[in-house]
Amino acid sequence: MKAADTVILWARSKNDQLRISFPPGLCWGDRMPDKDDIRLLPSALGVKKRKRGPKKQKENKPGKPRKRKKRDSEEEFGSERDEYREKSESGGSEYGTGPGRKRRRKHREKKEKKTKRRKKGEGDGGQKQVEQKSSATLLLTWGLEDVEHVFSEEDYHTLTNYKAFSQFMRPLIAKKNPKIPMSKMMTILGAKWREFSANNPFKGSAAAVAAAAAAAAAAVAEQVSAAVSSATPIAPSGPPALPPPPAADIQPPPIRRAKTKEGKGPGHKRRSKSPRVPDGRKKLRGKKMAPLKIKLGLLGGKRKKGGSYVFQSDEGPEPEAEESDLDSGSVHSASGRPDGPVRTKKLKRGRPGRKKKKVLGCPAVAGEEEVDGYETDHQDYCEVCQQGGEIILCDTCPRAYHLVCLDPELDRAPEGKWSCPHCEKEGVQWEAKEEEEEYEEEGEEEGEKEEEDDHMEYCRVCKDGGELLCCDACISSYHIHCLNPPLPDIPNGEWLCPRCTCPVLKGRVQKILHWRWGEPPVAVPAPQQADGNPDVPPPRPLQGRSEREFFVKWVGLSYWHCSWAKELQLEIFHLVMYRNYQRKNDMDEPPPLDYGSGEDDGKSDKRKVKDPHYAEMEEKYYRFGIKPEWMTVHRIINHSVDKKGNYHYLVKWRDLPYDQSTWEEDEMNIPEYEEHKQSYWRHRELIMGEDPAQPRKYKKKKKELQGDGPPSSPTNDPTVKYETQPRFITATGGTLHMYQLEGLNWLRFSWAQGTDTILADEMGLGKTIQTIVFLYSLYKEGHTKGPFLVSAPLSTIINWEREFQMWAPKFYVVTYTGDKDSRAIIRENEFSFEDNAIKGGKKAFKMKREAQVKFHVLLTSYELITIDQAALGSIRWACLVVDEAHRLKNNQSKFFRVLNGYKIDHKLLLTGTPLQNNLEELFHLLNFLTPERFNNLEGFLEEFADISKEDQIKKLHDLLGPHMLRRLKADVFKNMPAKTELIVRVELSPMQKKYYKYILTRNFEALNSRGGGNQVSLLNIMMDLKKCCNHPYLFPVAAMESPKLPSGAYEGGALIKSSGKLMLLQKMLRKLKEQGHRVLIFSQMTKMLDLLEDFLDYEGYKYERIDGGITGALRQEAIDRFNAPGAQQFCFLLSTRAGGLGINLATADTVIIFDSDWNPHNDIQAFSRAHRIGQANKVMIYRFVTRASVEERITQVAKRKMMLTHLVVRPGLGSKAGSMSKQELDDILKFGTEELFKDENEGENKEEDSSVIHYDNEAIARLLDRNQDATEDTDVQNMNEYLSSFKVAQYVVREEDKIEEIEREIIKQEENVDPDYWEKLLRHHYEQQQEDLARNLGKGKRVRKQVNYNDAAQEDQDNQSEYSVGSEEEDEDFDERPEGRRQSKRQLRNEKDKPLPPLLARVGGNIEVLGFNTRQRKAFLNAVMRWGMPPQDAFTTQWLVRDLRGKTEKEFKAYVSLFMRHLCEPGADGSETFADGVPREGLSRQQVLTRIGVMSLVKKKVQEFEHINGRWSMPELMPDPSADSKRSSRASSPTKTSPTTPEASATNSPCTSKPATPAPSEKGEGIRTPLEKEEAENQEEKPEKNSRIGEKMETEADAPSPAPSLGERLEPRKIPLEDEVPGVPGEMEPEPGYRGDREKSATESTPGERGEEKPLDGQEHRERPEGETGDLGKREDVKGDRELRPGPRDEPRSNGRREEKTEKPRFMFNIADGGFTELHTLWQNEERAAISSGKLNEIWHRRHDYWLLAGIVLHGYARWQDIQNDAQFAIINEPFKTEANKGNFLEMKNKFLARRFKLLEQALVIEEQLRRAAYLNLSQEPAHPAMALHARFAEAECLAESHQHLSKESLAGNKPANAVLHKVLNQLEELLSDMKADVTRLPATLSRIPPIAARLQMSERSILSRLASKGTEPHPTPAYPPGPYATPPGYGAAFSAAPVGALAAAGANYSQMPAGSFITAATNGPPVLVKKEKEMVGALVSDGLDRKEPRAGEVICIDD
């Protein structure tokens, strides 16, 4: 061991923790550990505080005081330093250096530690010594047996340390005393070891010394655990004394002032004060990594103070071992790597199965025998399996675990701090123990000039520097004025900060309920000046500040125990909870007090006056958000008795689930607590009989008990009717209606007869009450004691509970619902009084057979019947009640099957609609009731299918008679208010029509399948159409496009306009609100309810809502709020299914059924919520039905279904009648479609159409008039009442004539079914849509396109797109031209004789626009997507594809003009047509504009270099011009199969196209039309032919001058740039006046990242190396392509084909992308490779990129195959030649071209943006974050360059240089981390360049019209905006001047733009097509005019 090592002990007793450190050589013989050695901690959260004794002595030499290296400098404050070290060093060093490190649990008890120190004994040095008991005494005291063992000499040799001794002795002691507790075992072992060491004959040896030390350690631990609670001194006995330490160390310190320091303020980074701290350690501290702590049995290793090992080399001790641990340079690490940055969790290898403290011994130095032991505070066996082995240690408690014993088990030790599952559960946070130790080590360097100070450099409160007061127990520092209350002066003596003195919380906080400002603390008076004038009054004490206090609920305690906790306590003990609360709540203003009683203030004030207890509770609890119910006892569910005989009760609180039940003491002062205890014991006695444990005061006399319980034998005959209601009912205070009494009699009679029954009264007649009274009567009359099982929908369970309380007060009713935990508690405590009647735990187990059931009634939901069937199925039930029993209508449902397996004596089913759909369901109900009688479904159905109606009814009546009772409200309540149902027909809104048509078109195939569509798909279509009738926002697409508010809710206006129903609802609700009615709104779709919520919020109505997701308690609360007198809620939103069950909302008198259910019964269920007992007003029911839609048809079918199936007697109704036949579905779907598609044809005058329903105020008033009796639809009225007449008493069948009438009408409709209906209606829409889809598929996997509901289903809208734009804005530029004007259909018809075709015309069912039919419009769009905008002379060029050839120039130009105008029309893409009524045909502005823009950039780039690079990529392949002239001047491209379509045209433009190739798809990369495929095959078949045909140069007129002579070739023209600026990264690229020569082709022309070996795996995705960012900014001279000019070795490389062409053509090409893409990096590498290998053609580089772009200009976007087949671009094929024999060669090649083009496209877009930024003079404000980043980068660069030499010098061994290098590296690291932080913040601060329209302050349209006249040219406005991408005549010279005025805002300073900068560079993602904003046309179209000479040196601004 090194001299510096200390032995540290941990001892735990029950109440205290103690940590002792003392020099290893020193044993208790010398002296007692004084108060600084032993610190007592009250509480289990032990804070470890250590004090250093002197260093360990070498061998047996007497201990000297520590030797310091540099004494002189320290002498003056030596004593203070020692003192400080004693007091606070360990406390202060437990933290990381970082100021932010929070001190977790350590702070807590420092205060107590200090105050509880023991007072010094008599005198300074002499301490009272206490006898240590011998092992024999201890054993005697504890009554244990001693071990007889005589130690041999060998024992003394082998048992050299405590560990070995303990392993030897422990089993012996355990054998004698098998049940000995661990603590006693340890104490005895310690005593034994002490005696063993004392008797050791070999004492003098080194081994003995070490052994003695370990013994002392163990002894102290043991003595402490035994005796420390009494805190009496302990006397040592034992090994020989070592010399005591020098007196100086023991002297009491002089009084001193508390420690202060000068802080450096928040920004300052701390540096270690010690120059000798090795680098590795610094790194560790910087990262705040705790050291790796592995405990491995007996590995040789050296124990450092910090609790880690550093394994030591065998060479022997280091020379400086005594001086300092730190100097050895070893860092805490078990693995031996000094600088491992990340540590793994500490592991410990225990001895198998032994439980003991672990003392590790190890030889200190090779060759020496000395062994020292140390003890860790962790157990060395696994907590779970109690075995040893390799275990990991918890950082927050002494437990240890195997990795595999954890749950979930771990594969490897976790890194960093780790807390065990126990601590996690108890909420203990880790203690930074290792850091503490780590820093102690650092602090202990002997030669340090000044003490290591770990206190924070800034004040913990204000985060500022200055003179700070440092805590003696932790690293916190404070200004004295920041404390609360502020201190007037620095205090004397030791000072502890508020965190260290913060009291511990009384438990774990469950949640924070409220906060408030507390009282400010009392001020500290200023001390009197000693020399001051006594007359001068003392300064006024500084006032404290108020601090926040939090009202908290504790885990495991009830709300009665809630109390206030200080903010500091929460911050320390519950940091995460505190932070979350802070984040979610306003921490400046306390939350408003919530008068939890929920009543308005007036009522609660009155109540407070009357009830002082309530006032007190309000004051103390209720106003902080605690509901009174939560503090009200619901019932006591169990009791327990502690050792002292005190009773504790498990209390279930009202309105809280069972898992929040809490144990309360007997004496708790809770209202009604006594009564509940009384009833608990009384019920227990009833069930269990006499209980000896029962407290005497609760014991009842036998007689009293009998009154409570049921009679032991039946008191009357259940078959005898009650004429008046029985006494036990009257006692409850309730009165039954006569019909309910009849029901009760009938139920009792059936019970007596053993007949299971269905109670089928109509809704609202009180089936629940009749059932409860029936069960209660059975109990009270002694027929049965239960238990009864009631299964009901979750929503009605609360209602059942209430009714049971009311009508059956003596029943013990348990509600079995809730989560797993709640149900586990119910099973354990509520199923039986016997303790282990049922196994505990979350899984449900069977109940023991003989166990007595504790409850009378168990209420549960359907789901739990199936989920917990193990527990529930094991009980024998006297009666089962199923509420809403139509859940059993399907015998396949799990509920049916599970319930069938329960043991049940009697069954009662309740349902308001017994015969919902058909006989089959009725049969299943009967089958469930009496399976032995009803078990043949087929027989049953047949029997009732073929007899006449009368017989059927009679027979069914006889069959059902005994089992079913049904009464109607109409029969029972003659005076109940009437109800009127109206069907309200509503129009579809335009948006709904669009979606409706789309759905039909999209599903054309399903509708039209000859075998009749599959039923499921038809139902799906129907569902979609129903959604559409409700609201288009139910489709995700529409919802995405819809306008929203910042809160995420839909914007009200648009929401209402989009749906016909909402428009009507808006008007109705306003009127209803005025008239004071209240409304229930039912919808089947919960999403629709969401929309209705947004609608009601927008309209400002208060509402409640219930749907399937809102469960029992919340439901009932909502209902109660709505029904409360004077409630503000105006509407109640319900989902039809969830809201139809047992809910009473009789306070509302208007029901709106927003969408009808398929099943009319569900709707009846729904409106019966309002029309029920308790309703005082007439009920109006409005059923919204969309006119001419599936809804209207469904309503008709449903009416029929009501009539027929309600009778349960219609022939042929068998099983299938309930579900709709395909025929019916088809009929429903057809309904109204013809009219819908016809609608558009009438054009604009639809509003006047008489069939359109328009609701004005008058109509609404009529609709809401409650006096109308006649329903427009009398039959509906009658239907609904219809067999609400299945009375068992009398069957009445009314209105049979009407029934037949309706049937007939429908059957007639069914007869004349047109088999081709869908074919005629939808075929062409469908085909059109398929074309659209194919076009939009693009390449690769189709991105699911937004559902384009507007396209497809209209004849006149052949191919509309999901990206439609519609706008009412007039187009000012085109108004004067008739073809541009918006014209009515009539005008158009009259203009047919005019030369231009009309704007819109219908020809043979197809719409034509300006004479262009669908196919031609599609062809035109395809051409645009292929070549960009048509050039000026497009009509005379090959741009005009085959489909458009028939058009005159005028028509063509007019259409181009119209197309452009539509492109620029602002507005959402959602509308069906453009502003002028032209259908939007799949036109996505964004895509088209993007494509036009990209093609424009490509064309311009190619034109820029075309005159230098010529037209042929390999001029040697150029065909002989003489041969060429014989061919037609309009050569077809090689893709044409025959060369013979010579439609000559006078002038060819550079963007020639091949007329014969079909148009590509929009993103035509992947899909080719069949024609293309054919061509492609032909191309492969006939390569020779193609090469023969050759390819003529595009325009002979413009053919490049013959290749220059050799001399000329070597010197391409160099034209100087106007503004050459050396670019700083991030500065503006100068804009040359002449782009052709604008830059040298970046450094060199760049090489093939793919040689021939791999032409495909591009490096496009490499990130740009840092140094190269500037390489484009540094504008190199424009030298053409010098590096590319071949040396002599390349010269004759012309593939041997044309020897005569020896000179290389000139070549020049560049894209100035500012380094924002990786293009230039690629080019550099590729060119390097190409030049060095001489394979200029075979390695892809800059030259190939140019020709790729040229090919795209000629052949169109992504026509890779055409380009490869064109001889002009032969160079593109060169790099792939070596791959040609591979299987996937073509695909590989095309993929590479596509990827490469994406990169070029990206670079072009960025270049364009840079140009715009320059043009706009955009510059960045210096204060902007982007500039800070820029400055930091420059700083880093400068720093790096200026210190390059250091690394060489440092390596050469120059130590100062080494130190400086480290400093520089640290600075660099800081700079880089700052830059990293800046970069992460950047995106938020960046904004985009405003759209061009905003920058020019012009609308898109006016920009477009300006563009029509390019520059200053005088020619008149042409009939369409000229193709802005055609080259202006002067292109290539300086650009034409910008038109005056067009650029008004051009000079706008960047500072006027929206804040934020514009740098978003795609440097590391794959190249993506940079999406343009809507400005694309504007901005790119205006390229010609958007230019001017740039300013130099400005910041690059990019709009990505």
Curated annotation (Swiss-Prot):
Free-text tissue specificity from the UniProt record: Widely expressed.
Compositionally biased tracts (Pro residues): 236-255
Protein purpose: ATP-dependent chromatin-remodeling factor that binds and distorts nucleosomal DNA. Acts as a component of the histone deacetylase NuRD complex which participates in the remodeling of chromatin. Involved in transcriptional repression as part of the NuRD complex. Required for anchoring centrosomal pericentrin in both interphase and mitosis, for spindle organization and centrosome integrity.
Organism classification: Eukaryota, Metazoa, Chordata, Craniata, Vertebrata
Consequence of changing W1158R: In SNIBCPS; highly decreased function in chromatin remodeling
Segments for region (Required for interaction with PCNT): 1566-1966
Effect caused by changing D1120H: In SNIBCPS; the patient also carries a truncating variant in CIC; both variants may contribute to disease phenotype
UniProt entry tagged with the keyword ATP-binding: yes
Protein name: Chromodomain-helicase-DNA-binding protein 3
Gene: CHD3
Organism whose genome encodes this protein: Homo sapiens (Human)
